[in-house]
Amino acid sequence: MIRTEEMLLNVGPQHPSTHGVFRLVIKIDGEIIKEATPVIGYLHRGTEKIAESLQYTQIIPYTDRMDYLSAMTNNYVICHAVETMIGLEIPERAEYLRVLAMELGRIASHLVWWGTNLLDIGAVSPFLYAFREREMIINLLNELCGARLTFNYMRVGGVKWDAPDGWIEKVEEFVPYMREQLAGYHDLVSGNEIFLNRVKGVGIYSAEEAISYSLSGANLRCTGVNWDLRKDEPYSIYNRFDFDIPVGSVGDAWDRYVCRMQEIEESLKIVEQAVQQFPKEGAVLAKVPKIIKAPKGEAFVRIESPRGEIGCYIASDGKKEPYRLKFRRPSFYNLQILPKLLKGENIANLITILGGVDIVLGEVDG
């Protein structure tokens, strides 16, 4: 008589496909996953508690290290929260630089996701192409702020530095180049029969389930929910740009793939328009005291990061440090649906599903 026994298997915390220190304890019966339990906290640094002893400007470098693949949006959300509290008006040129930095960062983040996700399921070449284009974006951001990954570029009231001479022209040249490469990506991967068999019908959830789990970003839009804060609750100068919000219909790994690939195209549209509208002169930083004291009260802001809805709550008692600071970290919320998606799945689909959710462990652990 053939008999199988359930087995506990640890995926991580040093597994290459987790792209960070993340442990997944799975119970398997043969090749079927019966139960999956995420174990997080390996990268917890107590960012929110540390912030209570820092001045507002000193908090900005810490946000770089949450979602380190999209540090510009993290920079922005803390600055935006403080600016909301003190009622600060941002110079127009600074707003355009912020949008350019954030959208270039969004493209770079999605390129990392595209390359690593495909590498994890067996396609090596796309990884090399993705990092080739990402390197061009990183070089552009390096020229802008002097850093490649943890930028510390934005400030309460604007940005630290103006764009160097010729930088806008380089960004303008990058847009058609990236569009051409993106078409090549689709030719290489998006119609590949082997790839389609790995992602279509895998990791399905409904719009109702996505909302109940507080999912956001492509993980929400893949179910058909048309919700993007850049459109639905415009911040900065996003209401000046014409772009679409990609949505799916089935809510599987394929829809999540399509949404993110189309988001790259829409980000290129925003970058192109921002370059065309870019003010020829003007300040990049409002007049702000060196030591910022937010008035007593509280504020909550939220913006659209590559991984979803990132929020920042600040409670102030009138001092130069926040009384309480809280981040809504989208990767943490998006991770919560993983046990449901994995239950009953073949173990071969584990990495496809995990990669499709697209978490960053620095953001999960905070």
UniProtKB/Swiss-Prot annotation:
SUPFAM superfamilies (alphabetical): HydB/Nqo4-like
- Keyword Cell membrane tagged: yes
Where does this one sit in the cell? Answer: Cell membrane
Q: Does the keyword Membrane apply?
A: yes
Q: Transmembrane residues, as ranges? A: none
According to UniProt, the reaction catalysed is: a quinone + NADH + 5 H(+)(in) = a quinol + NAD(+) + 4 H(+)(out)
| Swiss-Prot/TrEMBL keywords | Cell membrane, Membrane, NAD, Quinone, Translocase, Transport
Enzyme Commission no = 7.1.1.-
Molecular function in Gene Ontology: NAD binding; NADH:ubiquinone reductase (non-electrogenic) activity; quinone binding
User: Subunit details for this protein?
Assistant: NDH-1 is composed of 14 different subunits. Subunits NuoB, C, D, E, F, and G constitute the peripheral sector of the complex.
Name-wise, this protein is NADH-quinone oxidoreductase subunit D
Q: Which organism is it from?
A: Bacillus thuringiensis (strain Al Hakam)
